[in-house]
């Protein structure tokens, strides 16, 4: 079967024996714990510190996690033991996550401060312990898209680059483990420097590095420069593996889940109504329909979207999924 190299099944594994929806696509092994978002290491009394990462970045509700998880761990090896005990239809591998690691060691300081020497020793020891117990590696996030549900940047993004490098070096001492990260964004020259630093770290530690790679509309040719650097550095001994999609990434939006307009004037009150009432009003209230459409046609001026939250509408990138064959009509058309 296929290996799904980037999932966030860390909580779902406790209530979903099948491993959906990965299992529906021929996947027999999933890799969880990406982007630094794991449920361990963490004390049960501090579970909200790790829940908040998954709530906003990955759209997993706190209520589902509270109901579906029987918390039986503190350290990452104990978390692995808990996963091992539940029935599973597919195989799982997991990273130890930087945001969870940071809040476990530093508490609330993780959101505002650099680590002390004692903090660094504790984090490096925890990573070594996790790798020896079977963790597939260490993950972090440098992505500006990753925020907590209480509107703070995730703890790993507070960490200076040298902290990340020190932890990867500690993992390298074990002779095992992959370094996974959610990539930062920036101007081309700055990003080329960052890619070079990853290549240098891989060569220094002997650890492979992996991350998702996207082509962005605002910088359509940037990815080729990055890939040229990666190819060159891999020939020199680095081990960098990008994860790419063979098609565009898409999100399915609906009134049953969320829409890009849920925070807009009039829409926000309308969307608080029960779904059946919304449907009824759309059918019967012509004045309300005109208001909703008029507001949706205006330039967006609401809060910035993060993680799995719906983005403001870009009609040329919204497609009407009314048929199976491509191409699909854009809403702009």
Model-derived segments and spans:
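Acidic, glycine-rich active-site loops and adjacent beta-strand->loop/helix elements
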Residues: 8-11, 35-38, 185, 215-217
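Short, function-defining helix-loop hinge/capping sites that tune catalysis or transport
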Residues: 12-16, 34, 142, 251
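Divalent-metal coordination cores built from histidine and acidic residues
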Residues: 15-137
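Di-metal (Zn2+ and/or Mg2+/Mn2+) metal-binding site signature of metallo-dependent hydrolases
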Residues: 1-21
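Active-site neighborhood of phospho(di)ester-bond hydrolases with catalytic His/Asp-centered motifs
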Residues: 2-6, 32-34, 182, 212
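Active-site neighborhoods of metal-dependent hydrolases
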Residues: 79-83, 89-91, 95-108, 113-117, ...
């Amino acid at each position: 079967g296929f290996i799904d190299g980037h999932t966030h099944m860390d909580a779902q594994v406790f209530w979903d024996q099948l491993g959906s929806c990965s299992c529906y696509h021929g996947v027999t092994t999933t890799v969880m714990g990406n982007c630094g978002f794991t449920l361990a290491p963490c004390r049960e009394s501090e579970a909200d510190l790790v829940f908040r990462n998954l709530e906003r970045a990955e759209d997993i509700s706190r209520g589902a996690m509270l109901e579906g998880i029987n918390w039986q761990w503190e350290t990452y090896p104990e978390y692995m033991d808990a996963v091992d005990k539940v029935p599973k239809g597919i195989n799982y591998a997991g990273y130890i996550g930087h945001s969870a690691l940071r809040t476990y060691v530093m508490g609330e300081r993780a959101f505002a401060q650099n680590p002390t020497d004692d903090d660094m020793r504790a984090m490096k020891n925890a990573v070594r312990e996790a790798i020896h117990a079977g963790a597939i590696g260490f993950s972090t996030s440098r992505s500006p898209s990753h925020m907590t549900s209480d509107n703070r940047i995730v703890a790993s993004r507070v960490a200076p680059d040298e902290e990340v490098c020190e932890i990867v070096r500690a993992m390298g001492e074990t002779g095992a483990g992959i370094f996974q990260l959610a990539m930062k964004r920036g101007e081309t020259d700055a990003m080329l420097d960052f890619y070079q630093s990853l290549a240098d770290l891989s060569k220094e530690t002997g650890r492979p590095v992996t991350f998702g790679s996207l082509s962005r509309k605002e910088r359509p040719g940037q990815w080729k420069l990055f890939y040229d650097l990666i190819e060159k550095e891999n020939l020199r001994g680095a081990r960098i593996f990008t994860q790419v999609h063979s098609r565009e990434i898409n999100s399915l939006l609906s009134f049953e889940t969320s829409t890009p307009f849920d925070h807009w004037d009039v829409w926000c009150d309308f969307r608080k109504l029960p779904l059946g009432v919304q449907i009824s009003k759309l059918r019967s209230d012509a004045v309300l329909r005109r208001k909703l459409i008029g507001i949706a046609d205006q330039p967006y001026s609401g809060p910035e979207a993060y993680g799995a939250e719906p983005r403001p509408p870009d009609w040329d990138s919204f497609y009407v999924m009314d048929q199976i064959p491509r191409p699909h009509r854009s809403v702009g058309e």
